[in-house]
Amino acid sequence: MENIQKFRKKGKKLGEYMLTKLRLLRDQRKYRSQGVTLKYMLDRADSRDLVIVFSSCTRKGIRARYNYVRTLKGVGCNKLFLLDDFASDHRGSFYLGSNMRFEEAATVKELIDRVQEQTGADRLIFCGSSKGGYTALNFGLDYPGSYMVVGGPQYFLGQSLLDTGNIEALKHIAGQVCKEKIEFLNQYLPRKVVDNRYVPSQRIYLHYSDSEHTYEEHIRYLCRDLTEKGYRYSEDVAHYKEHGEISLY
């Protein structure tokens, strides 16, 4: 009986994997601008809401993937899934760009604006966890009235890329890596949080664990700045020990 159950589980996972691959072949599109090719999937619905979902970071050796496609399957709204497969290892660049040019970020914003116009959406909801959480904040802060649903985000990007050994992403974003560029990246998101003029109209939903390293290194400083600047934000606090466990929440 145990072997049969294991076989069924493997079969289910294989089936889900094949369905995902088939969907990519059918639904994945490409948006090209400023020399950037941005891959995405768009689910249209009769709704005034648009959910924008960003990729998390994969393990070393595994290319970037779309996130939360199955999770949001039954949600009746427009959904834009964006793939961050930039950098030489195709694990992503936080949707920023190469050599400090930020052309990927500009392309992402172009596509979001275009899809918002096409769908007629008047409420934008930016979602992601870990790397995707950083990105959901980075883009969500640019839009008045936006909602940001964020899990375990990094806050000081330069140091995070150094600490996690994500050197390919760092080299892609910075070009020639130096202390000045690392510090610029460290302050990139904090500056946006502090200087944001849309604070009164925005809402942030933040999930994190207070027992894994991202909290002490990043999230407690993010919460400090959100509080000091008067953001409306809600916290969902867990206590798991490993950052990767965020995928279970």
Where are these regions (language model features)?
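Short, surface-exposed "cap/lid" segments of acyl-processing enzymes
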Residues: 11, 24-89
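Alpha/beta-hydrolase active-site loop
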Residues: 97-118
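Alpha/beta-hydrolase fold nucleophile elbow
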Residues: 119-130
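Glycine-rich nucleophile elbow surrounding the catalytic serine of serine-hydrolase chemistry
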Residues: 128-138
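Conserved hydrolase catalytic core segment
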Residues: 138-148
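Active-site nucleophile loop of the alpha/beta-hydrolase fold
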Residues: 150-161, 210
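The feature captures the conserved acid-bearing segment of alpha/beta-hydrolase catalytic domains
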Residues: 166-236, 243
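Catalytic histidine-centered segment of alpha/beta-hydrolase-like enzymes
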Residues: 241-249
